[in-house]
From Swiss-Prot:
Residues 300-774 form the USP domain. The keyword Zinc-finger applies. A zinc finger (UBP-type) spans 1-108, 151-259. Zn(2+) 1 binds at C25, C28, C49, H56. Keywords: Hydrolase, Metal-binding, Phosphoprotein, Protease, Repeat, Thiol protease, Ubl conjugation pathway, Zinc, Zinc-finger. One of its GO terms (molecular function) is K48-linked deubiquitinase activity. InterPro entries: Papain-like_cys_pep_sf, Peptidase_C19, Peptidase_C19_UCH, UBA, UBA-like_sf, Ubiquitinyl_hydrolase, UBP13_Znf-UBP_var, USP_CS. Residues 576-617, 639-679 form the UBA domain. This is Ubiquitin carboxyl-terminal hydrolase 14. GO terms for biological process: proteasome-mediated ubiquitin-dependent protein catabolic process; protein deubiquitination; regulation of protein stability. CDD domains: Peptidase_C19B (cd02658), UBA1_spUBP14_like (cd14385), UBA2_spUBP14_like (cd14297). The active site is at C309, H730.
Length: 775
């Protein structure tokens, strides 16, 4: 039966730049591995689950009226262990190794006519073949993250224009050996040479590098990595870095090569690097006999996308909070079926993640593992969900979270909460369950006068006592501490350098931190990091947690202010005028107030600049108005990065120091460190946030915050970190779950979900702690 909808408008032949979501539904985690597979739209290449899922394919059709889809399903192949390996006759890197693991099934159909289409139809055949050969959306997502880190260089910008001559690529081989694969062409002289050996073997004999050593020609392009849209591997041997050539089309035309006629047939350097990361062992070693692999609701693992364990451990911890999980599930049930742009909508991807992690539908042993080990008494681990769409959306435009590098889980958690708050579509802002108000007291050591300031927060840094008890192989050994001891240390006064506004003493001051309100969920970050010079070193201090996980936080409650306290005066602002410029301007006949106003407007710079400003503003109606104190106050800068604040706190600075340093250094971390260290006499009080006055705060306090005592919390989750830096190493999450009617600790290590007998491993690795308030 013919279909009138089988047209070039409805059936598109995708090019290399097209993102193809052929692995899973864009609105939920139903995938090609589930019964019934998924429907891939052949017009825009977004996918939706069919009748056996949540019918998101029908949702997509109703929104777009794209009629032609192909149902994609796959079944794992059984591994034949005694099959001899295929003889290697040439260097070959296959684009999609999944073909070795799965049998794929494709059924094209028209949703309007409700018929199955002939897969041999020429238009369908071309579209399906191009779709199969294209890079999958999940891989393209990760490759983009790696490629975003590449830049150009002076050697590319200043590449000399050579006379055009033709380089023959037919049956091309290395000029110094017979290799025809992994060929690199010199962008100076056009010489063809093989590349260096690659991770895992193969690659070449390094003759491209030898060519650079012999000639000094710095740039080469990998021929079979070039695609018609200008994507190509460029390597600068002089910089010893992979680069981007924005003028690759012009540079290739110098050698008579039109890139529009080329096709990418080999893996790029980014793909090879990604492959190495994905094959790296991110998992823990074999667990002890007391451990048990778990499956079911709330016990779904997340596949490591390559340095994404910080994201996985954070999301597992967040979705272990009942209020957060219920909120996101409700939005999933109401919003995901009406969202117009699911692949770029944060709320849609959060809802998708909620259904994936909480429902238990996808928490089951790996099909391939079961097929290849049918007689094993030990169930294989889960395959794990791959949250690449969520990672793409949440990291969009961010210089760190938009890459495939390891990141700080605490920074990511605070960043994510801010992102959710800004993009919330619900009447209830679920991130308010983490909100609380902190009070800081500054006390002059000389005159004893005090100042109180308040600010809002969603996380508190825990001071970890550091008592050295020995050394093993150059590594310091520290005494065990409890969370209660950390709480006691956190509320102790910190002494700081300070010049008092009241008594003018430079004796210093103390600051103490307390909490004016307590959130439903309290996030604590253990400050295990020490600033040694400009190097941040992680300290392996064991932190013991209570077996029952119950803690009383009354000691953190801010006390009533004593009636007999004397207060420091409100800070006033003055400016040291450029007296020389003022005298010269007055000598020209300008009144003092005009001289000052000109210098204020021009940064208190010099006579000539101020004079030019005066001539341009002689008619300003307020030019003779006396200067108000408010005009001398520094302008508030709301762009201070919370991630940068947390990074500076890891160096051992206070939040107030971090904010002040970043304000003074245009949000640059290195300059902020220099500024703080070079201003020992600066008063680093935390300025009250707008609207944070206690009277205003109490009137508008969210229903989740509490000022009631006793303040009791239950430890719900621990994000643990192995490694020397929060931006490297490996993250896992320990979460308290109900297993067989009892509260047990469960380890979430990427896709591995196991019951653990103890928290011994979390002692020296605990980094972020999530507590639930017991009301």
């Amino acid at each position: 039966m013919s279909c009138p909808h089988l047209t070039e408008t409805n059936v598109v032949i995708p090019d290399n730049s097209q993102v193809i979501y052929r692995e899973e539904c864009v609105r939920c985690f139903n995938s090609q591995d589930e019964e019934g597979g998924i429907d891939l739209c052949l017009t825009c290449f977004q996918s939706g689950c069919g009748e056996t899922g949540l019918k998101h394919s029908l949702v997509h059709f109703e929104q777009t009226l794209h009629p032609i889809v192909v149902t994609i399903a796959r079944q794992p192949k059984q591994k034949i262990n005694d099959e001899p390996p295929q003889k290697i006759t040439k260097l070959e890197i296959r684009e999609d190794s999944d073909e070795d693991l799965y049998d794929y099934f494709y059924v094209p159909k028209c949703l309007v006519c409700n018929i199955i289409l002939d897969i041999q139809d020429p238009l369908l055949s071309l579209s399906l073949e191009a779709m199969k050969n294209a890079t999958k959306a999940s891989n393209k997502s990760q490759l983009t993250a790696w490629e975003n880190e590449l830049t150009t260089c002076d050697h590319i910008i200043n590449l000399p224009e050579n006379e055009t001559y033709v380089t023959n690529l037919d049956n091309a081989t290395c000029s110094k050996c017979d290799l025809a694969e992994n060929l690199w062409m010199c962008l100076t002289c056009g010489a063809l040479s093989c590349g260096r050996k690659q991770y895992g073997g193969g690659g070449g004999n390094g003759h491209a590098l030898s060519h650079y050593d012999d000639t000094g020609h710095p740039l080469a392009v990998k021929l079979k990595s070039i695609s018609p849209d200008g994507q190509a591997d460029i390597y600068c041997y002089s910089c010893d870095e992979e680069r981007i050539d924005p003028n690759i089309k012009t540079h290739m035309l110098n050698f008579g090569i039109d890139i529009a006629k080329l096709n990418k047939t080999e893996k790029s350097l980014a793909e090879l690097q990604l492959e190495q990361n994905l094959n790296w062992d991110f998992g823990a070693s074999e667990e002890d006999d007391a451990s048990k692999r778990l499956f079911g609701p709330g016990l779904t693992g997340l596949k490591n996308l390559g340095n994404s364990c910080y994201l996985a451990s954070t999301m597992q911890s967040l979705f272990s909070i009942k209020e957060f999980a219920i909120h996101e599930l409700n939005l999933f049930n109401t919003y995901n079926s009406v969202c117009q742009t699911p692949t770029t909508d944060l709320q849609c991807q959060l809802g998708k993640l909620a259904d994936g992690l909480v429902s238990g539908k996808f928490s089951k042993p790996s099909k391939i593992g079961l097929l290849n080990n049918p007689s094993s008494s030990i169930l294989p681990y889960q395959d794990g969900l791959r949250p690449f769409m969520f990672k793409d959306v949440v990291g969009q435009g961010h210089s760190e979270f938009g890459t495939s590098q390891q990141q700080d889980a605490y920074e990511f958690l605070l960043y994510l909460l801010g992102k959710i708050r800004k993009s919330s579509i619900a009447k209830t802002d679920i991130t308010k369950i983490f909100d609380f108000e902190t009070e800081q007291k500054l006390s002059c050591l000389s005159c004893k006068r005090v100042r109180y300031s308040s600010f809002s927060s969603q996380g508190l840094t825990l001071t970890v006592p550091r008592v050295k008890i020995g050394e093993i192989e150059g590594e310091q050994i520290y005494e065990e501490v409890s969370i209660d001891q950390c709480l006691d240390a956190t509320i102790q006064p910190d002494q700081m350098e300070y010049t008092c506004e009241a008594c003018k003493s430079k004796l210093g001051a103390t600051t103490t931190t307390a909490m004016k309100s307590f959130p439903k969920v309290l996030i604590l970050q253990a400050n295990r990091f020490d600033l040694q010079g400009y190097q941040v070193k992680k300290l392996s201090i064991p932190i013991i947690v209570n077996e029952d996980g119950i803690y009383n936080f009354d000691r953190l409650m801010a006390k009533d202010h004593p009636n007999d306290e004397d207060y420091l005066p409100e800070k006033t602002e003055t400016i040291e005028w450029n007296q020389s410029a003022i005298e010269q301007l007055q000598a020209m006949g300008f009144p003092l107030v005009r001289c000052q106003r000109a210098l204020l407007a021009t940064g208190n710079s010099d006579t000539e600049t101020a004079m030019n400003w005066l001539f341009e503003h002689m008619e300003d109606p307020e030019i003779d108005k006396p200067i108000e104190v408010s005009e001398l106050l520094p302008k508030a800068d709301s762009s201070v990065s919370e991630e940068n604040v947390q990074s500076l706190c890891e160096f051992g600075f206070t939040v107030a120091q971090a904010r002040k340093g970043l304000l003074e250094s245009n949000n640059n971390i290195e300059r902020a460190v220099d500024w703080i260290l070079n201003h020992p006499d600066e008063s680093f009080e935390e300025p009250p946030l707008e609207g944070s006055d206690s009277s205003i705060k109490n009137e508008n306090m969210g229903s989740w915050e509490s000022t009631n005592v006793p303040v009791n919390y239950n430890l719900k989750a621990i994000i643990s970190h192995k490694g020397s830096s929060a931006h490297a190493g490996h993250y896992v999450a320990f979460i308290r779950k109900e297993i067989d009617g009892k509260q047990q600790w469960v380890l979430f290590n990427d896709e591995k979900v196991l019951q653990v007998a103890s928290l011994e491993e979390a002692k020296t690795t605990g980094y972020v702690y999530l507590f639930e308030r017991l009301d």
